[in-house]
Amino acid sequence: MLTLKTLRDDPQHVIEKLAVKNFDARAIVEKVLELDTNRRALQTESDAIVAKQNQLTKQIGGLMKDGKKAEAEEVKKEVAELKAKSSELLAKADENNKELEAQLVLLPNMPCDLVIPGKGAEDNQVVKMGGPEVNLPEHALPHWELAKKYDIIDFDLGVKLTGAGFPVYKGKGAKLQRALINFFLDINTAAGYKEVEPPIMVNAASGFGTGQLPDKEAQMYYVGLDDFYLIPTAEVPVTNIFRDVILGNNDFPQKMTAYTPCFRREAGSYGRDVRGLNRLHQFDKVEIVRIEKPENSYAALDEMVAHVEGIVNKLGLKYRILRLCGGDLSFTSAITYDFELWSAAQGRWLEISSVSNFETYQANRLHLRYRDAEGKMQLCHTLNGSSLALPRVVAALLEDNQKEDKIVIPEVLRPYTGFDCID
């Protein structure tokens, strides 16, 4: 979340930057500043009472030493009154601070200066396109029909077992999933990312730390009996590894990668966007996470974008990179680059990765800090990206590599699959 210092220093700047996200922050900012003023006034009053208590307590000791018990008893009454008032002030301060926190979490992260205003996806900026042109056979099929033709993904069986959005991968389809996961992890670890295998359920503190709670609670699966949430992305548990951590000045960068199943309710999804693998409730994804000093985070972001682009190029797929406009930027992100693959069979672009810099927004929630060269405590910057999300990668691989009688596996994946085609 945004720091109080940021709001105090230039509230108008905060309001203007959040307007780029189409978020009207004025009322919340004004309320936060009012509550912050109350907080400081209550703290000043409380400190004065504590100082007076300490003074009177010393006075009582002196009176007792001089045998002036009656006077000491009168001072004790005064101390008791101060204690009662102190308790009352603490209760007021606690209530005020809870309301202050509740208001602060309503404010999204401010977009960085590279982010332009815009209503939504239609206003995102295409910053790069690459990959080979796709040449499909005459009777090309979308991936859901290819999956049925070659018996590699069973959507109907998933409906029987669970419901829509929970496909069953079979035979070479299952092996392709496993191959992609291992391929992505190998590339990530070769680039210096440490592999971790985190839990796929997290507590509310973890969900709050990375900003999924309360903002995206409606999109998360909740396990009520145990008060856990199924993760929508490995970003949540991996970034929370650093919750309440103080790093040293020389502990950077922190680079981690993880494969996890991911779970998203995706309430309200309908139409062609949900056909086949286009939008699922359970899917596999490999994630990269970095913790950086503020002065290095944008260079790290560029490295992450180049890293993801390198993976896509190795797969030989047509892609484009978008810089999201303010209206399409997530609640927690300061800047995001999306990667999309071209599905010639569907005639549309499929998102496969988002790479984001959250600056200090998540770190402030996580209490993730470091001591700089002068020993001062500073907030870290957090970044993450999909490297990659599997469903739409699989969709594009199947569609763009189809021939009349088979699907050709990209050469880089063959050591992982053990086969060169699906037929």
Named regions from a protein language model:
Residues 1-134, 152, 156:
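N-terminal alpha-helical targeting/anchoring segments
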Residues 26, 129-423:
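TRNA-recognition modules of translation machinery and tRNA-sensing kinases, especially anticodon-binding
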